[in-house]
């Protein structure tokens, strides 16, 4: 019989995305075997992130200040704004070290089946931001799934009349991928988005 505190820890860890019962048990045993300071630091870090991290008032990224580092960085190009679904998507783009503009995080995608419409996303704030800025190009970097495509199409129709250049990130085959293993939708997208060399 496992002690109740350990069962409670396993149950809480198993609620994390991508963590099943076995992984939760391994994590719990790791925490149990680790020095006491480790558990204290872990619980302090969790408490701190809940108390201090919130949304940037400008782009809705995560920050522990009023505005995030991306919005405060004067070296970033104010004329180019990249719209992403989540903070995780923003970080994925940042890891490429290619994008030098600014961001706007929607915190989701349009999904009528799940009851998510434009009012549940940060679209109104995006429009307000565009009215008060020097943005010339808007890059839509939503995922290439049904909801991401619907969101990109909705935003395109909404923003084109504003005279902005609205672009979409390219889609197709991954680097190092094999044609023979690519699905039909990916191949079709790669063919239609081909470019001159």
From Swiss-Prot:
It comes from the Bacteria. A zinc finger (C4-type) spans 56-71. The keyword Transmembrane does not apply. GO terms for biological process: DNA recombination; DNA repair. This is Recombination protein RecR. May play a role in DNA repair. It seems to be involved in an RecBC-independent recombinational process of DNA repair. It may act with RecF and RecO. The gene is recR. It holds the Pfam family RecR_ZnF. One of its GO terms (molecular function) is DNA binding. Belongs to the RecR family. Keywords: DNA damage, DNA recombination, DNA repair, Metal-binding, Zinc, Zinc-finger. Residues 79-174 form the Toprim domain. It comes from Myxococcus xanthus (strain DK1622). SMART domains: HhH1, TOPRIM.
């Amino acid at each position: 019989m496992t002690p109740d505190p350990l069962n409670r820890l396993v149950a809480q860890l198993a609620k994390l995305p991508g963590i099943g019962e076995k992984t939760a048990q391994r994590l719990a045993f790791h925490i149990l075997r680790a020095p006491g300071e480790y558990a204290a630091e872990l619980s302090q870090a969790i408490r701190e992130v809940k108390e201090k991290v919130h949304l940037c008032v400008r782009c809705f990224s995560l920050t522990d200040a009023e505005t995030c580092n991306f919005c405060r960085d004067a070296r970033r190009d104010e004329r180019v704004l990249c719209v992403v679904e989540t903070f995780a998507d923003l970080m994925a783009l940042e890891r490429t070290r290619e994008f030098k503009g600014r961001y706007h995080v929607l915190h989701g995608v349009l999904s009528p089946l799940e009851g998510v419409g434009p009012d549940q996303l940060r679209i109104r704030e995006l429009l307000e931001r565009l009215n008060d800025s020097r943005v010339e190009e808007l890059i839509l970097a939503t995922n290439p799934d049904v909801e991401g495509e619907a969101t990109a199409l909705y935003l395109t129709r909404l923003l084109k009349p504003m005279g902005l250049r609205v672009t979409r990130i390219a889609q197709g085959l991954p680097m190092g991928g094999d044609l023979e293993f690519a699905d039909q939708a990916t191949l079709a997208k790669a063919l239609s988005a081909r470019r001159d060399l």
